[in-house]
């Protein structure tokens, strides 16, 4: 039997997680994707399949603020930004979708920053 690599294992974990976690209009899903250099977040309403709010380290307005920070510090900035944008859009409660990643490091830093920014999980 072939050995499963880390990426495939994460995808399997994410599929298993998605069976249990679904976003609604009242409580959308905060989805996290972590790449080698960047981190992306979206607030998604799964009933109609639309992205309500998004934030990532590739946002042009954050370029100067993120320069020289570690990836974990950048995740904190993104967590605060997604919380601010969500509250402006009238979203105060979300379901957290960690994307198959361990709740550790950048994912944990983003989640805690979003909580401190005013989002309820």
From Swiss-Prot:
Record's keyword annotation contains Cell wall biogenesis/degradation: no
InterPro entries: Ribosomal_uL18_bac-type, Ribosomal_uL18_bac/euk
Keywords: Ribonucleoprotein, Ribosomal protein, RNA-binding, rRNA-binding
GO MF annotation, one: structural constituent of ribosome
Cellular component annotations (GO), alphabetically ordered: cytoplasm; ribonucleoprotein complex; ribosome
Paired cysteines (S-S): none
GO biological process entries: translation
Family statement: Belongs to the universal ribosomal protein uL18 family.
NCBIfam families referenced in this protein's UniProt entry, alphabetically: L18_bact (TIGR00060)
Function of the molecule: This is one of the proteins that bind and probably mediate the attachment of the 5S RNA into the large ribosomal subunit, where it forms part of the central protuberance.
PANTHER family per UniProt: 39S RIBOSOMAL PROTEIN L18, MITOCHONDRIAL (PTHR12899), LARGE RIBOSOMAL SUBUNIT PROTEIN UL18M (PTHR12899:SF3)
Assembly with partners or alone: Part of the 50S ribosomal subunit; part of the 5S rRNA/L5/L18/L25 subcomplex. Contacts the 5S and 23S rRNAs.
Protein name: Large ribosomal subunit protein uL18
Organism: Dehalococcoides mccartyi (strain ATCC BAA-2100 / JCM 16839 / KCTC 5957 / BAV1)
Lineage summary: Bacteria, Bacillati, Chloroflexota, Dehalococcoidia, Dehalococcoidales
Protein's gene: rplR
């Amino acid at each position: 039997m072939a050995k499963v690599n880390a990426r495939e294992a994460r995808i399997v974990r994410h599929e298993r997680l998605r069976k249990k976690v679904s976003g609604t209009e009242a409580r959308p899903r905060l989805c996290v994707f972590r790449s080698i250099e960047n981190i992306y977040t979206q607030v998604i309403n799964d009933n109609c399949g639309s992205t309500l709010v998004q934030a990532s380290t590739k946002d042009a307005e954050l370029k100067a603020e993120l320069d020289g920070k570690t990836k974990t510090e950048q995740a904190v900035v993104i967590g605060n930004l997604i919380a601010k944008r969500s509250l402006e859009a009238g979203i105060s409660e979300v379901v957290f979708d960690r994307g198959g990643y361990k709740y550790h490091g950048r994912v944990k830093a983003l989640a805690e920053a979003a909580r401190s920014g005013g989002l309820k999980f």
